[in-house]
Every structure is written in C-alpha cells, then in structure tokens.
Curated annotation (Swiss-Prot):
Pfam families the record matches: Acetate_kinase
Positions contributing to ATP binding: 16, 207-211, 282-284, 333-337
Assigned EC number: 2.7.2.1
Function: Catalyzes the formation of acetyl phosphate from acetate and ATP. Can also catalyze the reverse reaction.
Organism: Haemophilus influenzae (strain PittGG)
CDD domains assigned: ASKHA_NBD_AcK_PK (cd24010)
The protein, known as: Acetate kinase
Family annotation (NCBIfam families): ackA
Gene3D superfamilies: 3.30.420.40
Amino acid sequence: MSKLVLILNCGSSSLKFAILDPATGEEKLSGLAEAFFLPEARIKWKLNGEKGNADLGAGAAHTEALNFIASNILNDELKNSIAAIGHRIVHGGEKYTQSVIVTDEVVKGIEDAAQFAPLHNPAHLIGIREAFKAFPHLKDKNVVVFDTAFHQTMPEEAFLYALPYSLYKEHGVRRYGAHGTSHYFVSREVAEYVGKPADQVNAIICHLGNGGSVSVVRNGQCIDTSMGLTPLEGLVMGTRCGDIDPAIVFYLYKTLGMSMDQIEETLVKKSGLLGLTEVTSDCRYAEDNYDDESKPETKRALNVYSYRLAKYIGAYMAVLGDDHLDAIAFTGGIGENSAHVRELALNHLKLFGIKIDHERNLATRFGKDGVITTDDSAFKAIVLPTNEELVIAQDTAKLCF
C-alpha cells in the first residue's frame, strides 16, 4: 500500500478525520466523532465503503476519539501505511503563508493566533497534542495547513480596516479571511475547467456552507475575501450575522443592556438564517418552504441571504477591473446543492450580462459539477465540489514524503 495521510480537523466538541492517498486522491477512511464531553459522545466512520458507529462513553473527547480510531478502526495494514498527519488550522495570523511541519515555534504561533479564532485554534492544538500521543512514531511528520494562508496575498487596500493604524501594527487587527484551503482548491479547479494555467486564472469563488465566504482571485492569487479579522464578517451564514453596522453592538450594550457575552452569542450563534427564520439555520428549510405563504420567514431569509451574496459577487467583479473574469464558482454544502440560492443570487447580476440556465442549474447538484449559465452568458458560473482534505493531504505529503 502507498504512503497515506491521516487528516484531522478538530473542533471544540467534535473531530472530523480521514485517510487519503495524496497521489491518487483515494479516500480510505472518513468519519466524525462528536458530542464531546456529553453523555452521548459517539463516533461514526466509513472504511473501504463499509459504515460503522460506536459510543465513545459519557464525557469522552479528543483523546478517547483518537485512541478509538487507532485501536478499533484502523487495521494493521492501514495503520502501518499512515506516513504523516495533516491538521486543518483555522487561523495562522500574518505569520504563516503556507503549510508547515509542526514545531514548538509553530505551536506557539497557533496559540498566538487563537485570539482571533478562540473557538477553533485551541481545539486544533488539542488535536495536535493528542495526535502526538496516539501516533508517537509520527511526531515529526505532523503538518498544519492554515485556512488563512491563501488570503495572505491580499494587497494592503483590501486587508486594512479604516481604524487607527496602530491597531494593525501593534495588535494585528486586519482582514485575514477563512476557508482558504477550499478557495485555493476551487481556484485550481476553475483553471482546469476553463483551460488556463493556475497562475493565470481570474475567478470569484463562493464557498457556501453553514459558514460562507467569497473570494476574488487574480492570476491565481487571492486579492480580496469577505471574511475579516474573524469568520464573523461578510455573508449571511447559518447562525452568523455577517456584515452589520458596528454601532449595533453599542445599541445592544448601552440601550438594551445586553452583556458582551450575550452580544457575542447573538451575533455568532443566534443570527444569520437562524435569526431571520427564527426556526433553523438549515438553508434547506428555507428553500423547501420558500413559496409557502404560511411561512414568510423562509422567503425573507433566503432573499436576504442571496442579496448579500450577489452584492459581494458584483463588488468583486468591479475589483477585477479590466482582467477578464473566467468564472464564478459555487462550492460548499449550499453552493454545490442549492440551485435556488444560486439562481436568486445570479438573477441580481443581469446587469453584467450573466444569464443562468434554469435546467442546467437544477441538474448540477448533489456532487455533480458543471456550468449553470447559458452559452451566450457574458460570464460562466460553475458548480465545483471542493476537496479540502485532498489539499491537506497533498501539502502534508510534499513536506513529509
């Protein structure tokens, strides 16, 4: 068996894992351990096409999950074929512009950037430490892949906020972006789709899932993106508000008497589609009930969501200027599967000569890729499934094999 990469994506209460062959992209194992620290902590997986699941035990967390993977899921052949471990890291700050092998200095850098990703980076560090314990023979073969790295090519006019400059120089307050691994992968897929070298492609990429972001790519490099200092800025998301007037925070604090913790919870966990529907953060609910007059919240939510998305796409078309836009790409759970969201958003952009093909759009869902605009559309819109795990596996292999 060829050299394989174990991929870990640690959240505060969950752990996604996979084993890939970086040379072929073949997935040997995928799974999710979830409900950490709760009585119902559990793990589910698919190994060589066969599904399995198990209880991890009340209160189980990252340690128990990784030990279970190593001891109960992996057979000897698969375990012996794992030659390196790749970790997804949400925030690398300004320091990291590419993937690196884990060292004490790198761990310190991830800790320093945790102030901008307090829910994610500490969990990633737990994953790294537990991987060292579960696979001690691979301690020098752990690689971190940063979601912020792809966006580090943004020019100053894109990443600076109009705040006192000292906040940037002394405290690192600037736009960093997120979902960079996905944006990188899809930008390369666009290049292949339109028959251009990756370093010549110009694209607008819409990664739409429970979290969502848009980036604009010129000559293969990111020049702007919608998420900011944290993943709260930008698009309407599942539970996150995206762009708002910053003075709303003052109003909630001073006039409504909300604490800063309550305000943070409102903006991060109670807003977005959940806030607009007052029912759910699931886009499918809004899509399925869009025309139901007894549920006006669904149309309200989806219209706000798609309008915000269209504004970003239109703005980024302007940012490209004279550089020809090769394609608008949709990816992520909503981007790949919600024909309705794509159509609502693109219909706002008819001024640019974009014409969506209704039948193509409906046919391009559930893992299918393809062009969803008409042949005479001024610009192509394409659906392209993302594969962040493959990027992590390939980056890890480059550094370790």
